[in-house]
């Protein structure tokens, strides 16, 4: 290629770097991709695009780009670093460890590399230990937990919770959380136990309508961004007898108020079981919670048992909600097999499989993503797969649906309508992780089943960083 191609490509890389510095990750990816199209022999173009993919949680793409950079220049240490980060994000700790070792060996004075290497070694040891002691059917986390015997001191300055949830308790809980206070662990245990029992009895696919004089609001990922959740309620109304909410998974992890969101949504679910609906997301799972902050947050704010009971409640959550026989709402997306139908979801016994694993219907419902190309493709995340507009069309036509509504991915405008209107993504965590300049969105659905998209901006929150409770330093790099 002519030197002019390299010069033009380098100029595009500079524009990509500028967009990256402004937290405009999709724009950065576009510029790096244009640079590669001009000149595909420069490893930094691929390595920089890998870093932008990491910010977009496209970890599979990041691994592929970092690997390409190393094919072009095996001495390009930065690519090992980025591939290690991406592998850590999708829990491929052993692959990450190999790359962290390379970085630490090549840069012996790099203190950060030594810390990340040590953290990754701990993750590998923990994974191997947990696998060694794993039992097929563990006892309930509520076994031997005598909630009634837990005493609440007279000094507790909040509203007391008796045997049933009240609006008064919820109102007080919201104010406590806003002011950096907790509720008593007894009340937290009560809430989780009550909701675990409620959702366990619900079908794997909950089927609901929207009655005259009422509305339903569908929210996407909230990821521990408690103050942005309150902004949704401020703008759109709090849950009530006439106003139901459906939260489409990923209530927890990343944001540092995950226990607050989970307890608030659970409290509303207990108060109005038919007015709050909760789908499971890929972050309502043990593997993700142990890496992305929720386990550490439970331990820091309550205790280890609190995480275990939450984990058990997460495994009981429904996987999908069908609205008016027109919209299938699920966290990730569609399936590897065109023959999969709504009846297959109905028949899925989620209670026999507490965690989604690496394959199968539950994993696909929690992890897959849409793509613009027809057919199916490998996952940009490195987990699951991607499905094209033809896949969505066939599924909707076969099952009599107007569209699927999913979450699972940042959208810069808060939502996106794709696949000829048949695939809708809604994401409700604006300024995601305090680094992405995205808006949040939610969808209001009335009795006529028309979709009304609402967009909102992030609001200020106390100075606690995302991932503050993650139990290793690696994830702070994401």
Curated annotation (Swiss-Prot):
Alphabetical list of InterPro entries matching this protein: Calcineurin-like_PHP_ApaH, Metallo-depent_PP-like, PP5_C, PPP_dom, PPP_phosphatase, Ser/Thr-sp_prot-phosphatase, TPR-like_helical_dom_sf, TPR_rpt
GO cellular component terms listed in the entry, alphabetical order: nucleus
Alphabetized UniProt keyword annotations: Hydrolase, Manganese, Metal-binding, Nucleus, Protein phosphatase, Repeat, TPR repeat
SUPFAM superfamilies, per database record: Metallo-dependent phosphatases, TPR-like
UniProt-annotated catalytic positions: 283
The reaction(s) this protein catalyses: O-phospho-L-seryl-[protein] + H2O = L-seryl-[protein] + phosphate; O-phospho-L-threonyl-[protein] + H2O = L-threonyl-[protein] + phosphate
Subcellular location(s) of the protein: Nucleus
GO MF terms held by the record: metal ion binding; phosphatase activity; protein serine/threonine phosphatase activity
E.C. designation(s): 3.1.3.16
Region annotated Catalytic, chain positions: 151-463
PROSITE patterns recorded: SER_THR_PHOSPHATASE
Family: Belongs to the PPP phosphatase family. PP-5 (PP-T) subfamily.
Described function: Protein phosphatase that specifically binds to and dephosphorylates the molecular chaperone Hsp90. Dephosphorylation positively regulates the Hsp90 chaperone machinery.
Stated name of the protein: Serine/threonine-protein phosphatase T
């Amino acid at each position: 290629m002519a030197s002019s191609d390299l010069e033009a490509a380098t100029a595009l890389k500079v524009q990509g770097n500028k967009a990256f510095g402004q937290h405009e990750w999709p724009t950065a990816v576009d510029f790096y991709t244009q640079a590669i199209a001009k000149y595909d022999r420069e490893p930094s173009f691929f390595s920089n695009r890998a870093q932008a993919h990491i910010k977009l949680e496209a970890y599979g793409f990041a691994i592929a780009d970092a690997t390409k950079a190393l094919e072009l220049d095996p001495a390009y240490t930065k690519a090992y670093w980025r591939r290690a980060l991406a592998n850590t994000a999708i829990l491929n700790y052993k692959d990450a460890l190999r790359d962290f070792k390379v970085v630490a060996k090549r840069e012996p004075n790099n203190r950060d590399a030594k810390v990340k290497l040590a953290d990754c070694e701990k993750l590998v040891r923990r994974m191997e230990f947990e696998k060694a002691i794993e039992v097929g059917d563990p006892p309930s986390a509520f076994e031997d937990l005598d909630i009634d015997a837990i005493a609440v001191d007279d000094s507790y300055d909040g509203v007391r919770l008796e045997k049933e949830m009240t609006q008064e308790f919820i109102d007080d809980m919201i104010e406590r959380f806003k002011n950096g206070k907790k509720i008593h662990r007894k009340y937290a245990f009560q809430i989780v136990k009550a909701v675990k029992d409620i959702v366990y009895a619900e079908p794997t696919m909950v089927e609901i309508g929207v009655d005259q004089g009422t509305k339903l609001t569908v929210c996407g990922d909230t990821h521990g961004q408690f103050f942005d959740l309150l902004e949704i309620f401020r703008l759109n109304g709090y849950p009530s007898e006439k106003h139901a909410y459906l939260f489409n998974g990923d209530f927890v992890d990343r944001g540092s108020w995950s226990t607050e969101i989970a307890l608030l949504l659970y409290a509303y679910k207990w108060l109005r079981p038919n007015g709050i609906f909760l789908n499971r997301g890929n972050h309502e799972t043990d593997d993700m919670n142990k890496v992305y902050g929720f386990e550490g947050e439970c331990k820091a704010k309550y205790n280890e048992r609190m995480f275990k009971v939450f984990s058990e409640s997460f495994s009981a959550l429904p996987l999908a909600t069908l609205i008016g026989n027109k919209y299938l709402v699920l966290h990730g997306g569609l399936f590897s097999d065109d023959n999969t139908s709504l009846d297959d979801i109905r028949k899925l016994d989620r209670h026999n499989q507490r965690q989604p694993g690496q394959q199968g219907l539950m994993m696909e419902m929690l992890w897959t993503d849409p793509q613009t190309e027809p057919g199916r493709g490998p996952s940009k995340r490195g987990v699951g797969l991607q499905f094209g507009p033809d896949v969505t069309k066939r599924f909707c036509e076969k099952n009599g649906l107007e569209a699927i509504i999913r979450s699972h991915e940042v959208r810069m405008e808060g939502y996106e309508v794709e696949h000829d209107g048949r695939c809708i993504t809604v994401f409700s965590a604006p300024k995601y992780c305090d680094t992405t300049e995205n808006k949040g969105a939610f969808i209001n659905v009335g009795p006529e089943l028309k979709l009304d998209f609402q967009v909102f901006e992030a609001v200020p929150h106390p100075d606690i960083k995302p991932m503050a409770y993650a139990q290793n330093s690696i994830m702070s790099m994401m």
